[in-house]
Amino acid sequence: MLCISVAPVSRKLSKADLLNAAGQCDLIELCLDHFLKEPDVGDILQGIPKPILVACRRPQDGGKFAGTEEERMTLLRQAIVAGPQYVELDLETAPKVPRFGKTKRLISVMSLDGPPDDVDAVYDEAAKVNADVIKFAWPAPTFEAVWPLLKIISQKRQIPTVGLAVGRGAVTLALIGRALEVPWSYAALERGLESVPGQPTVSDLKDIYCWDDINSKTRFVGLVGPVDRQTAITARALNAAFRKLDDRHRCLPLPIQSFDRLGERLERLKINAVLVAPELARAAAEHAEKREGSAESSGCADLLIHQQDGWTAYQKLWRHAAKVLEDRLGRKDEHDHPLDRRNVLVIGCGGLAQAFIHGVQRNKGIVSVTAANEKGAQQLAQKFNVRHVPFHNLYDTLADVIVIAEPSIQMGHGKADINAGYFRTTMAVMDLSAMPDDTPILAEARARGCKVVEPSDVFRAVLAAQFESLTGKQFPATVWDDVLANEP
């Protein structure tokens, strides 16, 4: 089930929010601690066609209630008399609030310092205060912090258990919980109405991650990296393609802290493939048991696939980004290589730069590398035996192709910025740092008459190659245009 958290500040807003949520979920959590004035819960609940879970949390539990503890207890008792399906009680409050009517008791264990030392002991304590459902919640900014919550909600216990991840791991927990068929997972009604930081909205879960499609037979494809706009677009596009081909795979964001023990945990979740964000490409290649040719030679990986002999790393970006660039340079056929003997300046020293340098070299381009991080650029130049250009000498260095491969590079006049005057009409410019989105650098390059390689074209080409590796099928041609048309 899906539980939408509603945290209104006024009685007038609460009615509208509850009715809005009712059409999109199975259970509604009404957070009384956000009200500016004491609400009439009985009146608010009248006419709401979905079961209600009432909560009124203390600040130490992540709530907003500003009154005294006695006032909070009074409000909870009044709420129970109104007859909601559930009332949330913390371990300290529960013994003071007797069971009343048909309202079930959700005993909440919020631990702002992380998982309790003894989960079983806490579970037993919650059972003693007449819990019908037990909720465990703690900060979970990473997949590693989500993992103990996953272990708890996946265990078969006498009393049903739900979990709430506070932070970026909330989407991950909600989606896996859906596949595990836990009693419910939490979502916010819309952006700005989250009951806890990092809570996904109902549209995030349904429109991006295909909540309604997920069940015990779903096979997840991990998206390793930050839970950001690029991850959302990747998930939306891949999920649309999976759905169009009637494939049971769906995307799962994995905001990891490191690759340590990741493979073991993925195997326990029966996840056999992950796409890797550019900033983690080098670490992904290092942690794989095997590296396919380009992943070995570039030292980067954007795709990991689990096989019988372990995890194998693949690098898809170099080939397809280089192909899109050469198409923009006027490639005539598959035997023509416009990069041959062209001077290509790569700006950046991270995983994107490393992968692309490998691609340019494979296409016989002449590579130079520069970055505001001089040490990183020097090391990259040594690794690939290419020319290093000190960043302060950038404006004395002319090139046929400029490739931005570092998100920190901006237009401007600072020491680590690029001045617009650098661009010439003879240049081709490619910015990989914010794919598939456009950037101010590309806008300036267009205005100055440069040949611009569209980042959405590169993103689509790489994503299509990854999709084919995952499924053995071609990426549906119409999906990408549909996804871009619906992006804000």
PLM feature segments, named:
Residues 329-331, 428, 432-488:
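Adenosine-phosphate binding glycine-rich loop
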